[in-house]
């Protein structure tokens, strides 16, 4: 499974540098209805231990001004704590790019190589 530059903690997103733009879509955590809707999705409170997780690669940009990299870091840590043997949960942090906008061709190729490498490894695919 691959998740690129995700927003995972909806209760904190409005406090992020670009968070004000997400309020219209996701609501404010001070509003009871928004809090009730967003609370079950928090990576710090959800429990993926109830079922096995697939191998995962999450990506983020170290200097992303649109999506706080802490979202991917927290989600990765939570999933790693619940991962099954042989099902790695990996975080790829790009030091020179944000969430894809302005990424160089070599950065895009490097990220896609990692995505496909994990997929091929998990499917047991080998070079001929």
Predicted regions and their residues:
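Active-site-proximal cap/loop segments of hydrolase catalytic domains
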Residues: 1-128
